[in-house]
Amino acid sequence: MRHYRNNDSGVALIVVLMVMLILTTMMLGFYFVTTGEQKVAASDRDNTVAYYGAVGGLEKMSSDLAAFFVSHTSPTPSQIDALTGTTYVPSLPGVTFPAGGYTILYTTAGSGLYSTQGTIQGSGPLQGLQGIITPFTLTVTASGPNNTEVKMTRVVQEVAVPVFQYGIFSDSDLSFFAGPDFNFGGRVATNGNLFLAEDGGTLIINDRATAYQDVIRAQLSNGFVNGTSGRYNTTVDVLTTAGGCPGSVAACRALALTEGSVTGGPGSAVNPNWTTLSVTTYNGFIRNQKTGAKKLNLALALAGASPIALIQRAPVGEDPTSTTGSARFYNQASLRILLSDTQAAFTNLPGIDATKQPYPLAEAGSTGMSTTVQRTNSGGSYYLSPTGSCNPPIAKSPGWAADNDYMFKINTTLLGGYIKIEMQLNATPGTWQDVTKEILSLGISHDVQSGAAPCAANNAILHLEEAKPIPTEGAPNSFAVAGSGNLPNTTYFYVVTALGPWGESLGTEASKATGGSSKKITFNWPAYPLAGVTGYNIYRGTAAGGENRYVSVGVVTTYTDNTLTWPTAGTVPTSTLTTLAATTTATNFVPVNLYDPREGEVRDNTGPTTLTFMGVMNLVEIDVHNLQKWFAGTIGTSGPQALYNSGYIVYVSDRRGNNDGSNNETGEFGYEDTINPSVTLGAPNGVLDAPEDVDGDGVFRTYGAHPYYLNDNLVTDPAGLFDTSPLKGTIQGLTALNAATTRTLTALQGRKNPVVLFRRAVRLEDGTLGNLPPLAAATCTVGASGGFTVAAENPIYIEGDYNASVANGFNDAVGKCHVPSAVIGDAVTLLSNNYNDTSDMANPTTLGGRTASTTWYRTAIVGGKNLSFPQPTWGNLDSGTDGGVHNFLRYIENWGGQTLNYRGSLVSFYIARQATGIYKCCNVVYSPPSRGYNFDIDFQSIAKLPPGTPRFTDVNALSFQQAILPSQ
């Protein structure tokens, strides 16, 4: 048998070799797998570095762009390009940005950036509103280690939203706590706390509401706890679905007292249920910062200026094209009206027309003052021509000694200071042309007359003075009854009126019984106090108020009645043209003053019949209708050349009497000792209380309690009114701070004399439907558009119907249309159609003498308010608040039983610096109206916004993506 054992030799070696081969192969496989994974991991790591480098670069670019638009509203392409320069490119370890890898793409239109108007998309705080949209594409390519690259793009919008797209906005705390139902409409936003309460009726928030701080339901801003004694605890409805309140009750829900974002007032514990309430229950229709609300800022606010810079006069040296300068209405205006105590105050103001000097209103003793005022440092004179009763001269005081007519100063002008009026040219924006002479030559007084009739065409745009109020003739007196007459045994009632260039005065009734038949009655009356009397009318009747026949007599002061039947039928005048005078005598005119009890009375206490100096406000009155004519060129010559930018803007800054004691103008009242919460009657306490610090800087200012006037004081004043300081006067009693609010004057003194404190204001009149500029739009010309904005550094009063009318309400009429309108001032007060300066002065603390009538206003309003403070021991439950949204529009009349109809947008950017009188109701300052308030939905269209509407800015991200590069 053959054996094969030797044939098996070497098999083991083969097996070993095969195993070795397999193991080697496996090891090679493991090696390649391991090294491959390492390479993949390294590549992934490098790509991750590049990826996060690209993301970081994109976030840096987005942040820089957002920060840029915080302080720039109209950037140039070069400014955008600069944001991609080397100083902006981030420095990241292991990452570089190749050339062309850090860019912002945009579309140009001419020399600027292309923008569109439209609805804002995305999820930012301005989403859903109409705005100016400027699109950008942000692109970042980041190179990482080992030639890795990642490219990221983001599409964003820079959006600018006009503030009047909001129904109500406040930069500080915002309070709702009306008694009757209140449903204004439009979006609601505040950069502070949102206090929501209602006292009897229902408050409806029928659009989105946001508070950057907290939503507070538990108390008012003065700390009053809602629900105490059953007050301020009724329904606050907030919508839960678009189109909800009040259209669908099911789509809104009452926000309970316990459902604020905090459990109490500001700074209290967070409500643990708030996020669910805000985001889920109310579907985001009410938010605070915790649930997505953002702060809304004007560009100038985050550029370092306070929002009140909008209305402040530009300081010397400021660039009009800077962020702050371009936001000021001083620079935006078509027409600006500036008044100061000295010519030096105008020197070097930005953009000023230095070729013309300011016009003097207070040159005591100027040659020929009755017809002209000399300019102090130029070769010529300004003439207020034509000189006549329809175009009177500058008011001059006849003096206390001249006729004992309640005048303080002798032989000095009553207006004071200098005025400069300039027009910005439409052909070359930024260039200003002096038009002072042209404007003043149209007239400076209102309600003047020629002969016995009002002037047919009084074209005055500015009313700086008015005819001296016509006194009421005194009552008959010194009655004597004698026999041998023709009068029967009866009682006769008599009224005597004075005749003269003013027409016919009012009279005062008196009566006398004959005491028997066949009698005659002799009586006297006081001589009328004005010069120019041509005679008297004597009215007689047999019942009080029934004087129905009269006789006319000459310039005498006695009469004997011995006639059974008087020859002429007629009734006693019940009203007189109290501000009419047919005269060219400067002493027959007085300043335009009113009394504001909110400013003058520190507490809501009735009784005093005298005025306080703080409440007498001197007005620059603007006849809106005549201004419309001037812009259209139907009066004057220059108006059509004025800057037209979606309409016209008029700016006013009156700083006469504004002096901080170091000859500096501040634009602020400067008296911060008027609230004194711990003092029941409000007497100054000599310290700065928190709500008095309107600047928020902790500095106690009292210079506003002292008058600074520029005459030499060598004139005769009523005893004790002024001290003898040669350059500044201190009202006796104001020298001691504890007497500042007790110094008083009579109604006639307040009406006829210049203000002695810095109390200047603007009043708009004759602004009914169809009277606002531009003329073509207001008269309903087909295709015409444009609006009208008035901005002032001072408080503004609107008298009578404005951009609407009693006859038509908020509707337009044939040939009379509303225009987009805004009124922007330190504070805004609405005066009714029935308002009268004389009644106002005569009834400083008596509402019965200041009765309002139903009036209509259609305009956006921006104004200041006052700081809230803890509820004091005096006053009402809401004392210490700012009055709430329902009292943001100020009143100084008895509106009881009347309706105040308002349509517009309510905006508060700042704390008032001049109208510092606190909210108080309802004994002295006003009685509330029935409020017909609502948001003007026209403002939801950018084309229907007033010129110069301030805007919020934001950068809104729309999309984000990563591009796949070939190198990846």
Task: Describe the predicted segments one by one.
Residues 470-580:
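Disordered, low-complexity "stalk" and linker segments at domain junctions of extracellular
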Residues 39-71, 190:
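Membrane-proximal N-terminal amphipathic helix
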Residues 70-135, 144, 162-165, 169-469, ...:
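C-terminal globular interaction/adhesion domains in large, modular proteins
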Residues 151-161:
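A short, surface-exposed beta-strand/turn
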Residues 144-151, 502-508:
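Short, exposed coil/turn segments at beta-strand boundaries within extracellular/luminal domains
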Residues 2-7, 14-53:
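Aliphatic-rich helix starts adjacent to a transmembrane/signal segment
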